[in-house]
């Protein structure tokens, strides 16, 4: 249906000589684009406002040709959420859905940060924070934490000491680290699935998105998690 609608729209624009062959999402596009330069790319992932991952599956039954599997991994639900995760989920537009995405993505990390901070500071209402705010806090440094102090003053009306700001930065980092490790765990699961009973093959993971590209410490924590989970096999993955 989508292909037909796209084809009709192209014709209306006078572009009748283009025939759409396939409709793909951004996750699959990341894998395919990376595979042009890195033929051993097996996993494509979006780590941004939302989260999803796909992978190239070769071991399909009945002689079916290799196929890219879109996992919709943001909807994974066999997790161990904490009470802040549950509070965020219950207040969301679709409670019970996209549980992993609500624990890892840029859309929700700032909200989680605000929920925890409200309890930590004993605030009467949850302050509004975004992942951009978290990035600013993570970029801020000792000894003064000036940007963090200014941001917290704006959002909460409270003037914090440098020690308080250091604790707030630690909270932001903890939320980011958990996000990166959960996302990386999904990659490790795919890698182990593809390896089966054999050794982990040399392969490339293509990751795109605002959290991975722009949030401080995101890339470093994904890489660290790969080594923590895969051990020596992580040397086969880049």
Residue ranges of predicted features:
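Short His-Asn-centered micro-motif
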Residues: 24-27, 47, 208-209
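Short beta-strand scaffold segments in enzyme catalytic cores
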Residues: 29-33, 44-46, 51-57
């Amino acid at each position: 249906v989508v292909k037909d609608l796209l084809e009709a729209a192209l014709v209306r624009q006078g572009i009748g000589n283009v025939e759409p062959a396939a409709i793909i999402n951004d996750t699959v596009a990341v894998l395919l684009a990376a595979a042009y330069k890195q033929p051993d790319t097996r996993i494509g992932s979006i780590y941004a406002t939302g989260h999803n991952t796909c992978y190239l599956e070769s071991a399909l039954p009945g002689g079916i040709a290799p196929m890219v599997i879109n996992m919709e991994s943001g909807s994974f639900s066999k997790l161990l959420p904490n009470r802040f995760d549950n509070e965020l989920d219950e207040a969301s537009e679709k409670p019970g859905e996209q549980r992993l995405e609500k624990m890892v993505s840029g859309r929700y990390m700032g909200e989680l940060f605000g929920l925890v901070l409200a309890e930590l500071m004993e605030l009467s209402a949850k302050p509004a924070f975004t992942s951009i705010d978290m990035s600013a806090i993570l970029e801020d440094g000792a000894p003064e934490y000036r940007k963090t102090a200014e941001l917290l003053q704006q959002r909460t009306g409270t003037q914090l000491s440098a020690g308080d700001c250091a604790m707030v930065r630690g909270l932001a980092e903890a939320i980011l680290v958990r996000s990166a490790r959960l996302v990386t765990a999904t990659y490790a699961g795919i890698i182990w699935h593809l390896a089966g009973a054999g050794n982990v093959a040399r392969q490339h993971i293509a990751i795109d998105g605002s959290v991975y590209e722009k949030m401080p410490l995101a890339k470093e924590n994904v890489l660290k998690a790969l080594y923590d989970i895969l051990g020596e096999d992580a040397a086969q993955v880049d």
